[in-house]
């Protein structure tokens, strides 16, 4: 009887304790248990800035972060809280199903269950990587690349983890999953990449909270900014003097000891930089981290490395400072466009010289028609020597209108985006057999190689290499634009931004990204017309130019 009474007493106490929890931070401290490198019950001691994030009352929250600042654990705790306390279905989105969602399930979710007796009790089915059940409540884990995976899962809580690495055009589909719920809580977190894209685009619409704390020396409220609060020692990343770099209070100039951060940051608060914004935003750099890997000496070595190559430059600003950054020359600028405006107006028809056309396919068919000026003596890469004159750039609704453009401008060769209207694009290519190819951006193609399929209707190219060439013309001033060029064209060619990364072998690689709401159709039409040039030359420019039957 005593054992039964004790059990009932324990359950009543547990129930009362459970009902007293009204904040995610309380839930985390009560029920979350962590593994290495900080094993034991959840604590805010090493990451005090996370408490305010946990307990945000906003419906829409944005976290623009440096790497390894605890934001993922925060949104995971918030997810568990709403599943456990409110019984709300949640959708947790990662960049890709494989390996991201699979790794998240194995490395984050499953250990959280194994280490917490409370979570073991509430989750009844955890075997499915993409679907975890807690009684009648569901946690869906999805990759952003699969549209089907983001459909038919109505949820009240949505988490986008590493938004900048996601397929941006599928994000609105994930948001639509909340339309049927009375409670709609959203968290978007990510290390940023470039301005006005991904997480930064949303963060700029938020309160942009900064973490302030009391200086242990002068007691004034301060925040940490680079380079204002950093004393930089040494001259390069291998200089041992760099280890002497340290953080200071910019008000009293006293040193802030790295080992003491966990104490003087403890009672800090988030202070909004902007008021009357629709979203609650949190931004923080690694200068706040008390981790050994974030010691000021190591931080400054990363800063010195950033001066040596664009990949480390990008990495320092994004992962260390938690700030977006555009490396010089990474995007087309207004000044470059202005410098390329010629004396001509757009043509209505044209019948002289070598002419190509590129078409990007979407709701509209965006096209660019180019006349090429080729010197008498050229090398094997004709694009390097040729100068381009844009004689018309615009958009139309139907492929039949492209037929008229082919005829009126005597287009020698055209390259058309093969998706999403592959059937219509193929029919167009068949009508102009030998003078039109469908283009696919593919893998396994290096440099400016063009892989032509056996049917010779499809070509596969490396996206980054060709965009480097086609958009690089604006910087090199090897392209002439009409004076009546549309603002839409200018906006589209400015949309792609080249970001720099290192692959698994440490080699420098680049790729182009754009904002969720940005359009780059004319940029790709420009690219396809560039690809059409060597195809036109290889097939001969003296072919019969009559329109198809």
Residue spans for each PLM region:
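C-terminal/domain-terminus segments
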Residues: 303-308, 394, 439-441, 541-549
């Amino acid at each position: 009887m005593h054992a039964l009474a004790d059990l009932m007493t324990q359950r009543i106490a547990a129930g009362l304790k459970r009902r007293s929890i009204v904040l995610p931070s309380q839930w985390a401290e009560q029920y979350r248990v962590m593994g290495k490198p900080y094993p034991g019950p959840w604590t805010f001691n090493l990451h005090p800035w996370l408490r305010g994030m946990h307990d945000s009352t906003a419906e829409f929250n944005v976290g623009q972060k440096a790497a390894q600042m605890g934001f993922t654990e925060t949104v995971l705790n918030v997810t568990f809280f709403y599943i456990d306390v409110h019984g709300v279905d949640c959708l947790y989105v990662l960049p890709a199903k494989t390996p991201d969602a699979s790794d998240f399930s194995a490395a984050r979710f499953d250990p959280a269950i194994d280490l917490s007796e409370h979570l073991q009790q509430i989750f009844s089915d955890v075997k499915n990587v993409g679907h975890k059940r807690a009684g009648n409540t569901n946690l869906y884990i999805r990759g952003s690349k699969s549209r089907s995976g983001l459909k038919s899962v109505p949820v009240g809580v949505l988490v986008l983890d590493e938004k900048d690495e996601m397929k941006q055009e599928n994000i609105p589909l994930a948001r639509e999953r909340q339309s049927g719920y009375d409670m709609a809580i959203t968290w978007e977190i990510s290390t940023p990449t470039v301005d006005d894209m991904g997480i930064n685009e949303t963060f700029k619409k938020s309160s942009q909270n900064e973490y302030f704390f009391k200086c242990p020396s002068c007691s004034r409220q301060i925040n940490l900014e680079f380079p204002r609060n950093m004393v930089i020692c040494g001259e390069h990343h291998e200089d041992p003097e760099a280890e002497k770099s340290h953080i200071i209070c910019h008000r009293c100039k006293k040193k802030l000891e790295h080992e003491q951060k966990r104490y003087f940051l403890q009672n800090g608060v988030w202070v909004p930089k902007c008021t009357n914004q629709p979203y609650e935003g949190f931004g923080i750099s690694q200068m706040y981290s008390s981790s050994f890997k974030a010691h000021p000496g190591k931080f400054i070595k990363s800063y010195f490395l950033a001066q040596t190559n664009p990949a480390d430059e990008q990495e320092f600003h994004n992962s260390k400072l938690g700030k977006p950054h555009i490396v010089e020359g990474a995007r087309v600028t207004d000044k470059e466009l202005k410098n390329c405006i010629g004396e001509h107006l757009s043509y209505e028809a044209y019948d002289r010289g070598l002419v190509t056309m590129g078409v990007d396919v979407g709701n509209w068919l965006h096209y660019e028609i180019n006349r090429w000026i080729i010197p008498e003596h050229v090398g094997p890469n004709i694009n390097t020597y040729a100068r381009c004159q844009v004689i018309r750039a615009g958009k139309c609704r139907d492929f039949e209108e492209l037929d008229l453009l082919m005829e009126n401008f005597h287009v020698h060769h055209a390259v058309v985006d093969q998706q999403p209207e592959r059937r219509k694009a193929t029919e167009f290519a068949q009508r102009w057999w030998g003078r039109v190819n469908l283009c696919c951006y593919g893998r396994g193609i290096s440099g400016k190689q063009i892989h032509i399929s056996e049917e010779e209707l499809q070509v596969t190219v490396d996206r980054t290499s060709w965009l480097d060439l086609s958009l690089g013309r604006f910087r090199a001033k090897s392209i002439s634009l009409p004076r009546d060029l549309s603002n839409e064209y200018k906006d589209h060619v400015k949309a792609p931004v080249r970001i720099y990364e290192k692959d698994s072998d440490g080699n420098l690689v680049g790729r182009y990204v754009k904002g969720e709401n940005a359009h780059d159709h004319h940029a790709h039409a420009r690219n396809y017309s560039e690809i059409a040039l060597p195809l036109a030359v290889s097939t001969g420019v003296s072919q019969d130019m009559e329109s198809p039957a």
